[in-house]
Amino acid sequence: MAGAKDSGCDDDLRIAGGCDPGKRGNPEDSSSPVEVSCSICLESVLDDGTRSKAKLQCGHQFHLDCIGSAFNMKGAMQCPNCRNVEKGQWLYANGSTRPFPEFSMEDWIPEEDLYGLSYPEMQYRVHWCPFGELSQAAASFEELEPATTTYHTEFHGHHAAAVNHSYLAYVGPGPAATPRTSDNNSTDDHPWNSHSNDHFHQLPVAPQYHHHSPSFSLPAAHVVDGEVDSSAARGLPYAHPFLFSHRSNQRSSPAINSYQGSSTQMREQHHAYNHQRQQHHANGPTLASPLISMTRRGLPPPPPPPPMPDQNVGFFIYPGGHHEPETDQIHAWERDWFPHFPVPSNHRTIPSLWHRHF
């Protein structure tokens, strides 16, 4: 019949359900590809190579970038259509199974030790010491101490002799300082070390026996400056303060070590000076004293000092007593370099008058 023939399907196929009345052609044509849309971006999932696609185990297909964004947000591969969770180990774009990179405790510790002893955290190059090692911190503070403008009075080692008196005699201008004694032998940071190789003038000490001088008393020790003529001033280099010591355990100084004489030569100079002093008293004074004494009102002026046997800068020491016993002897500067000088037995308490003579 024509109606049956027009339908394109015979009776057997229609009963079996293998023929669709609204579709013409062979039964093999029913296997043609079907367009599938992505439920995330609502675009067609095509296998044309423009975009990658992913097919889950449930059969639903999505674009690979779309299902990947959903996986990054949820942390699990769950189908947006049927809500089934895919089992298995899924990798993120960074190649890890976790959305963030793994960090261990070692990664959180910085490479640079912030509390190292050599790491400056404070101003002025002060090193931080978190372990209580105060010795290393003190060594760091030594670098911060500026060079002082005053004379240091800690004399130890071979640089100068220690002093027990309350006065300080020095050559040249300089601020006054209070002498202190120290037994420490570390003299590396002493500001005088830079002048240890300089030429030092020897300072001969002229004794006064006071056998021919009238007795007088002074209230305290004075340091009197004499007149400096131009020739002597031009020949004076930078002068350092030198101290006289009366202690038994005296130490050597660079000024004494630089002297090339011996105790025998000093004794010979001492005898020559005594002979010249006797001639000076016999012939009378020939040179007016340039010294200006500072005494109390009403006291007689001190006697003029005798001239020095040489032209070197020197100090005259006038003990405050009169007719002292000559058995009490001390050494000035060094025990082996200078002769014995008579001083009063209580020389540690009686003040003296100091004159500087050029």
Swiss-Prot record:
It holds the Pfam family zf-RING_2. It is found in: Nucleus. It catalyses: S-ubiquitinyl-[E2 ubiquitin-conjugating enzyme]-L-cysteine + [acceptor protein]-L-lysine = [E2 ubiquitin-conjugating enzyme]-L-cysteine + N(6)-ubiquitinyl-[acceptor protein]-L-lysine. A zinc finger (RING-type) spans 38-83. Pathway: Protein modification; protein ubiquitination. Residues 248-266 have a biased composition (Polar residues). One of its GO terms (molecular function) is ubiquitin-protein transferase activity. Keywords: Biological rhythms, Flowering, Metal-binding, Nucleus, Phytochrome signaling pathway, Transferase, Ubl conjugation pathway, Zinc, Zinc-finger. One of its GO terms (biological process) is regulation of gene expression. Residues 1-34, 174-201, 248-313 are annotated as: Disordered. Disruption phenotype: Photomorphogenic mutant insensitive to red and far-red light leading to long hypocotyls. Flowers early particularly under long days. Also impaired in phytochrome-mediated end-of-day far-red light response, cotyledon expansion, far-red light block of greening, and light-induced expression of LHCB3 and CHALCONE SYNTHASE (CHS). Enhanced expression of CONSTANS (CO) and FLOWERING LOCUS T (FT) under long days and short days. Disulfide bonds: none annotated. Its EC number is 2.3.2.27. GO terms for cellular component: nucleus. Mediates phytochrome (phyA and phyB)-controlled seedling deetiolation responses such as hypocotyl elongation in response to red and far-red light. Required for light-induced expression of LHCB3 and CHALCONE SYNTHASE (CHS). Negatively regulates CONSTANS (CO) and FLOWERING LOCUS T (FT) expression and photoperiodic flowering. PANTHER family: E3 UBIQUITIN-PROTEIN LIGASE RFI2 (PTHR46798:SF5), OS09G0511500 PROTEIN (PTHR46798). This is E3 ubiquitin-protein ligase RFI2. It comes from Arabidopsis thaliana.
